């Protein structure tokens, strides 16, 4: 039995290294070299085919604009202050209750201050009244970076933070800043004038994508009170000259046009649900995405 075990152990060692035939694991050095060379060439060819395929694919893709955008959803509508539960609740006589909202608006508006828009190589004045879409050429690097339209804080009126650093929260008249999310190459199409007849107090301009805020439910509409809008030229919406957006590579300092909404007479001690919607021929809404073209926020001013 001991001899059989020794014989088995010897054959195992011989398989690993056969000193007579100079074989390692049953193969000579030349055999190992040939098989390793085969696999190096084989996997090298596979890698070359893969890299070549990727390179060909990359040649068809622009780094400045997606090749296909037919399934890109319309832009979403967002409010500032940005809050997790879309609820704004505060007491006008308690600064601690609303300073989070004020700081949030402050931080967002920093890039809209005059001091941040001084460079004439980057920014340009696009007028104080709404105008047509601003075509800045093809989506490529032939013309270098594109200029960006300035947006003045003073256009936001009572909600600019210039005269009231609390944006109305100290007086129980909260401001909400509204922006349309960036979508590369998106060109807003304002609705026809006749299509807005069902929406009261909507100031029409063919070069403005209008926005309106109302109570979400019937009981909310009675409690919202008066609403003031502050935007470029006094229009409640987004002027077209700020579009289209050319992306971070061509417009790294791009500023979205803003609309400020101030609720000046909210019913106290009542949670009011408010919905704001943008209106346009290419603005859509989705039940699955409550921020697509609209948003709703709950506001409660406590005594």
Swiss-Prot record:
Region spans: immunoglobulin-like: 191-303
Pfam families the record matches: Na_K-ATPase
GO cellular component, one term: intercalated disc
InterPro entries in UniProt: Na/K_ATPase_sub_beta (IPR000402), Na/K_ATPase_sub_beta_sf (IPR038702)
Major localisation: membrane
UniProt modified residues of type Phosphoserine: 11
Location relative to the cell: Cell membrane; Apical cell membrane; Cell membrane, Sarcolemma
Keywords on record: Cell adhesion, Cell membrane, Disulfide bond, Glutathionylation, Glycoprotein, Immunity, Innate immunity, Ion transport, Membrane, Phosphoprotein, Potassium, Potassium transport, Signal-anchor, Sodium, Sodium transport, Sodium/potassium transport, Transmembrane, Transmembrane helix, Transport
Membrane topology: Single-pass type II membrane protein
Residue positions where Phosphotyrosine is found in the record: 101
SS bond list: 126-149, 159-175, 213-276
Sugar-modified residues: 158, 193, 265
Topology Extracellular: residue spans: 63-303
Single GO MF descriptor: ATPase binding
Transmembrane segments: 35-62
Protein family: Belongs to the X(+)/potassium ATPases subunit beta family.
Role of this protein: This is the non-catalytic component of the active enzyme, which catalyzes the hydrolysis of ATP coupled with the exchange of Na(+) and K(+) ions across the plasma membrane. The beta subunit regulates, through assembly of alpha/beta heterodimers, the number of sodium pumps transported to the plasma membrane. Plays a role in innate immunity by enhancing virus-triggered induction of interferons (IFNs) and interferon stimulated genes (ISGs). Mechanistically, enhances the ubiquitination of TRAF3 and TRAF6 as well as the phosphorylation of TAK1 and TBK1. Involved in cell adhesion and establishing epithelial cell polarity.
Annotated protein name in UniProt: Sodium/potassium-transporting ATPase subunit beta-1
Naturally occurring in which organism (per UniProt): Ovis aries (Sheep)
């Amino acid at each position: 039995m001991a001899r059989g075990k020794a014989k088995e152990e010897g054959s195992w060692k011989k398989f690993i290294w056969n000193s007579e035939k100079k074989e390692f694991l049953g193969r000579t050095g030349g055999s190992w070299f040939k098989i390793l060379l085969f696999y190096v060439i084989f996997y090298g060819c596979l890698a070359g085919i893969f890299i070549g395929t990727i390179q060909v694919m990359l040649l068809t893709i622009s780094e400045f604009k997606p090749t296909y955008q037919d399934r890109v959803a319309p832009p979403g509508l967002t409010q500032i202050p940005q809050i997790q539960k879309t609820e704004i609740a505060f007491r006008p006589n308690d600064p601690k209750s609303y300073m989070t909202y004020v700081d949030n608006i402050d931080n967002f508006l920093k890039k809209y201050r005059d001091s941040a828009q001084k460079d004439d190589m980057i920014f340009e004045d696009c007028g104080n009244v709404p105008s047509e879409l601003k075509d800045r050429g093809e989506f490529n690097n032939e013309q270098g970076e594109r200029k960006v339209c300035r947006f003045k804080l003073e256009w936001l009126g009572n909600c600019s933070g210039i005269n009231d650093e609390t944006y109305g929260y100290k007086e129980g008249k909260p401001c909400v800043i509204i922006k349309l999310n960036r979508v590369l190459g998106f060109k807003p199409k304002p609705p026809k004038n006749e299509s807005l007849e069902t929406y009261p107090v909507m100031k029409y301009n063919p070069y403005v994508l209008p926005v309106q805020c109302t109570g979400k439910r019937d009981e909310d509409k009675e409690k919202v009170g008066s609403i003031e809008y502050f935007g470029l030229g006094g229009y409640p919406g987004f002027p077209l000259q700020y579009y289209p957006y050319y992306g971070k590579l061509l417009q790294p300092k791009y500023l979205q046009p803003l609309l400020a909404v101030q609720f000046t007479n909210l019913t106290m001690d009542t949670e009011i649900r408010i919905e704001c919607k943008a209106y346009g021929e290419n603005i859509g809404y989705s039940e699955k995405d409550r921020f697509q073209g609209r948003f709703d926020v709950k506001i409660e001013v406590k005594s």
